[in-house]
């Protein structure tokens, strides 16, 4: 089912979208400061593509927590709390692939990626919440309202169930954008090695 929001429209991500989800998010992030920090120079684009196939593509499709534009030039994926209406737990094969492959994807950077993830996990809201894992729009499709449209289904789940949304970002531009849809900075952080600035943002549910 396509959700029509005027222009643009968004729909739930499907299995057939996984390659393009990975391609879109890789294009968005390939030269980012985060990618340079998280992934070695050797094979960075291939590593990033595989990461997004697993974490954004297969995880989001299998759990029902991903939305895309019709042409998949923009993507939003979430991690939902256990038992959230309309979602499913990640299949065992997806969990196993993530656990097995993430250290290899990050290569020599895995230690700081893992340690930083632990810091972020400790800072997340204590109770059930929706976690915005990935949000990206290809440069050729920006300034069309895709990002805001893609966030609406996940935020609607939050508002219906009375749960907050949260995320972490590494650029101030992302902070400014998310503030426009109701997120606020909960705390400023940095990666475990001090090399990457991070902001944890939380959006309270709206009645």
Predicted regions and their residues:
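Conserved active-site alpha-helix within GNAT-family acetyltransferase domains
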Residues: 148, 160-162, 171-188, 194-195
């Amino acid at each position: 089912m396509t959700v029509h929001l005027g222009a643009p429209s968004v729909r739930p991500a499907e299995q057939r979208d996984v390659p393009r989800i990975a391609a879109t998010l890789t294009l968005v992030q390939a030269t980012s400061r985060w990618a340079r920090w998280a992934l070695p120079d050797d094979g960075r684009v291939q590593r990033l593509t595989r990461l997004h196939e697993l974490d954004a593509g297969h995880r989001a499709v299998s759990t029902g927590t991903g939305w895309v534009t019709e042409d998949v030039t923009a993507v939003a994926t979430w991690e939902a709390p256990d038992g959230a209406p309309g979602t499913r737990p990640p299949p065992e094969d997806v969990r196993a692939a993530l656990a097995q492959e993430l250290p290899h994807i990050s290569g020599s950077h895995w230690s700081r990626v893992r340690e930083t993830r632990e810091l972020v996990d400790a800072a997340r809201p204590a109770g059930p919440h929706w976690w915005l894992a990935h949000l990206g729009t290809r440069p050729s499709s920006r300034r069309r309202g895709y990002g805001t449209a893609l966030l609406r289904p996940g935020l609607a789940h939050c508002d219906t169930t009375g749960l907050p949304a949260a995320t972490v970002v590494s650029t101030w531009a992302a902070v400014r954008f998310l503030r426009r849809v109701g997120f606020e900075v909960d705390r400023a952080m940095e990666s475990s090695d001090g090399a990457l600035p991070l902001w944890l943002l939380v959006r309270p549910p709206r009645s």
